[in-house]
Regions:
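Short, polar/flexible loop-turn hinges at active-site or ligand-entry regions and domain interfaces
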Residues: 99-104, 151-159, 175, 379-383
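Non-catalytic beta-strand/loop surface segments
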Residues: 2, 38-79, 105-139, 175-229, ...
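Short pre-active-site segment immediately N-terminal to the catalytic Zn-binding motif
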Residues: 78-86
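A common structural junction motif
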Residues: 148-156, 250-258, 371-382
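N-terminal secretory signal peptides that target proteins for export/translocation
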Residues: 1-20
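Bacterial N-terminal signal peptides
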Residues: 21-35
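Non-catalytic, conformational "gating/processing" segments within enzyme and secreted inhibitor domains
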Residues: 165, 218-250, 452-453
Length: 482
């Protein structure tokens, strides 16, 4: 199971929020490769779960090594749950949640956390929105009280909403509109999902953000911000009984104000055509090639998902990964190469591959070598050594993840918010151990195919402004492209 990553981060399951979450990805460091796989949990035998009378789910992850707690509230709503024409409202509401209630004026919550020596954050994904604080354990009742208050007590007026909308528009201009790589990533996301709401950016389309208003924010808030649509995760120096008592005294007093329904979204049809995009811009310092494939999430198909986890590690696992070893070390065509897979999603998700050519290498030559490497892997699969190294690396990440209570809280929160369970998280390492070389080869053969792919070229150019346009697939035997 994967923790939230950002996209998100190029997996832009894209976390976007007031602050960027600290744990976006695990970098492969020395290889210059970003393997977009977040840490997993190997064992968490002490995890406790219970549900309050108002329907709020609670997860407690005891960790007594330091007198500190991480307190998170996850709402089962993200950008993919937005009404058509109102993209960005989930992220916009995340901003507005810091604007105050009748009981606590704007900024007071953040000021109190800061005075207590704590940290806070919030982030929005396609499938969830989360808020968290990290404080000394004696301050847990304080942050629980504040968070419970703003669950239903937020005060929104035009004087609050409209200026914050301008803040979001400026955020979009800075992060996306002024960044060629982000523009291309956004276009690729839209090209990948032709029917599913994962197609629109988490921050929203500019023209639709401009039209968001107080009524939109209130309607979204009243529909989705209710205890029976929320998950409380507390990790740290606490006991389950203590958390239950505090949760009942704070969140337990919040009445549910909407009935939750199954999250049924338009699903992506089986893709039938390769899609290719190119963006040329004078601000591009390093050309790059990126390719994403439509694949199942863990919730959609556990067996395939775990095999895809192993595949991403075999292909993109640092300096020993197949792509880095082939394209960078052996052929000398790339300065970097990697792979990632975002398994934590409610619906079908993406598997990604990226590479950057050396200065004297054309991006077309690099792509041909990448195609050959993927085709060879789909034909022959991983070696026994590659498979063992990949599985060992994934399990090691799972063990290391237990050293960070914030990581544990994120992993459990993201899993539960996307339709999986705490048992799924705990069972994931044993599922990895059981993956065979044939399973890894099989998912590569079935999913790393042209019809399921969106390929992008980010190029250097003197042309301004940036322009993105579709590129026709290579007419010379596109069926050989993998």
């Amino acid at each position: 199971m994967l923790a939230p990553s950002s996209t998100d981060a190029e997996p832009d399951v894209a976390v976007t929020g007031r602050f960027m979450p600290a744990l976006m990805l695990i970098a492969a460091g020395a290889a210059g490769l970003a393997t977009m796989a977040a840490p997993r949990v190997a064992q968490a035998t002490e995890v406790s779960e219970f549900t309050l009378d108002n329907g709020m789910q609670v997860v407690v992850v005891p960790d007594h090594r330091a007198p500190v707690v991480t307190h998170m509230v996850w709402y089962r709503v993200g950008s993919a749950d937005e009404q058509a024409g109102k993209s960005g409202i989930a992220h916009f509401l995340e901003h507005l949640m810091f604007k105050g209630t009748d009981k606590h004026p704007a900024g007071e919550f953040s000021q109190v956390v800061s005075k207590l020596g704590g940290q806070e954050n919030a982030f929005t994904s396609t499938d969830y929105t989360a808020y968290f604080q990290r404080v000394a354990k004696e301050h847990l009742p304080t942050v629980m009280g504040f968070e419970a208050d703003r669950m239903t007590g937020l005060v929104l007026t035009d004087e609050v909403v409209l200026p914050e909308r301008d803040v979001v528009l400026e955020e979009r201009r800075m992060r996306t509109d002024n960044d060629p790589a982000s523009q291309l990533s956004e276009a690729a996301q839209a090209a990948m999902f032709t029917n599913h709401p994962y197609s629109h950016p988490i921050i929203g389309w500019e023209d639709e953000i401009k039209k968001l208003n107080r009524d939109d924010a209130l309607a979204f808030y009243r529909r989705f911000y209710t205890p029976n649509n929320a998950i409380l995760v507390v990790a740290g120096d606490v006991e389950p009984d203590e958390v239950r008592r505090l949760a009942e005294a704070t969140y337990g007093k919040v009445a549910k104000r909407a009935e939750t329904a199954e999250r049924i979204r338009p699903q992506e049809p089986t893709p039938r055509a390769e899609r290719r995009l190119v963006l040329a811009d004078g601000r591009v310092a390093q050309p790059s090639l990126s390719r994403t494939y439509l694949v199942p999430s863990y919730r959609g198909n556990k067996e395939d998902s775990v095999a895809l986890d192993v595949l991403s590690q075999v292909l993109g696992g640092g300096a020993t990964g197949r792509l880095y070893r082939t394209l960078v070390v052996e052929k000398g065509l790339a300065s970097s190469a990697g792979a990632w897979y975002q398994s934590t999603a409610l619906d079908d998700t993406r598997f990604g591959i990226s590479a950057s050519p050396r200065p004297d290498v054309s991006i077309d030559k690099l792509e041909a070598a990448l195609d050959a490497a993927i085709a060879d892997f789909a034909e022959n699969g991983p070696s026994a050594k590659e498979l063992e190294r990949a599985k060992t690396g994934l399990i090691a990440e799972a063990i290391y993840a237990q050293d960070n209570q914030g990581t544990l809280a994120r992993i459990y929160g993201a899993a539960l918010a996307t339709g999986t369970t705490a048992d799924d998280v705990k069972n994931w390492p044993s599922e990895v151990k059981a993956v065979t070389a044939e399973q890894v080869r099989d998912v590569a053969r079935r999913f790393l195919v042209p019809a399921r792919a969106v390929t992008t070229h980010l190029l250097q150019s003197k042309a301004e402004p940036a322009t993105a346009a579709p590129v026709q697939p290579d007419a010379a035997a596109p069926e050989k492209r993998t």
